[in-house]
Amino acid sequence: MGISEVQVFLALIIALIPGILADRLGKELNK
């Protein structure tokens, strides 16, 4: 259970990082 939970947590972080970077980049471009 512990290993699978860590894998899911890492997968969520890896999935969110590009979205956060794209959001920041979009805000900078909108200026």
UniProtKB/Swiss-Prot annotation:
Membrane topology: Single-pass membrane protein
Location(s) in or outside the cell: Plastid, Chloroplast thylakoid membrane
UniProt xrefs under Pfam families: PsaM
UniProt cross-references to InterPro entries, sorted A to Z: PSI_PsaM, PSI_PsaM_sf
Record keywords: Chloroplast, Membrane, Photosynthesis, Photosystem I, Plastid, Thylakoid, Transmembrane, Transmembrane helix
Family under the similarity heading: Belongs to the PsaM family.
Record's protein name: Photosystem I reaction center subunit XII
Organism encoding this protein: Euglena deses
Gene behind the chain: psaM
